[in-house]
């Protein structure tokens, strides 16, 4: 699918801005063509030291990237590893957030808990000003994720890669997430559509969110208001 076709898909679903997760060079090209339709997440190796910090600055200041992306799934370096700390400090200075992979992985050649929410707790304690979004919402450690969202003011989560229609199913493990997401944590949750992973149209995923037992103002927050505030899109 071309980017133009993808934007058409976004338009049909009522999506104004999408988040890009790809190689830095690919994202740079897309942002140059469609700067008002996408947010770019920068991928920087924790092994690159100050070279990586300088590259993050370049991507943000010259190429329009909006956040740092950290994923232990790929490099097997947990997000709380101190090699990431210069990057987190620079994110605070640049006033950009970081999206951290927070989920169990199914790869059999690496530890299953590389993305455990406990790593976020240490980061949030060490960098209280850093805006963090827990990508994939910490499944299957959902209760721990809920507790950490309550504990840290600048910690948020997104629902990418999880089918929304299962959030309300008894025994799914999402019970506390949905309960608190409709009340105390309503300002902390952002929707990730992941429609291609589900094999259904983008607008169908939006409809599944609309069918959840969420209060109307809460649904609006999940769908866009929380992301608008988190990414400073006002």
Language-model region placement:
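Short acidic active-site motifs
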Residues: 5, 26, 51-55, 141-144, ...
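Conserved, mostly hydrophobic/aromatic
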Residues: 10, 27, 59, 91, ...
């Amino acid at each position: 699918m071309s980017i133009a076709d993808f934007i058409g898909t976004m338009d049909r679903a009522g999506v104004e801005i999408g988040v890009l997760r790809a190689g830095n060079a690919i994202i740079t090209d897309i942002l140059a063509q469609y700067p008002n339709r996408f947010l770019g997440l920068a991928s920087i190796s924790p092994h690159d030291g100050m070279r990586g910090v300088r590259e993050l600055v370049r991507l943000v200041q010259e190429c329009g990237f909006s956040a740092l992306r950290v994923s232990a799934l790929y490099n097997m370096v947990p997000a709380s590893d101190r090699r990431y700390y210069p990057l987190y400090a620079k994110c605070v200075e640049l006033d950009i957030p970081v999206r951290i992979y927070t989920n169990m992985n199914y790869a059999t050649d690496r530890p299953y808990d590389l993305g455990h929410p406990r790593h976020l707790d240490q980061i949030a304690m060490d960098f209280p000003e850093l805006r963090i979004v827990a990508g994939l919402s910490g499944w299957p450690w959902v209760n721990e994720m809920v507790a950490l969202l309550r504990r840290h003011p600048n910690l948020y989560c997104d629902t990418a890669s999880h089918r929304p229609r299962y959030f309300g199913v008894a025994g799914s493990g999402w019970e506390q997430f949905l309960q608190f997401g409709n009340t105390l944590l309503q300002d902390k949750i952002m929707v990730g559509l992941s429609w291609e992973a589900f094999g259904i149209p983008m607008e169908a995923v939006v409809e599944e969110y609309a069918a959840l037992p969420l209060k109307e103002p809460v649904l609006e927050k999940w769908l866009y208001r929380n992301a608008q505030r988190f990414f400073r899109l006002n």
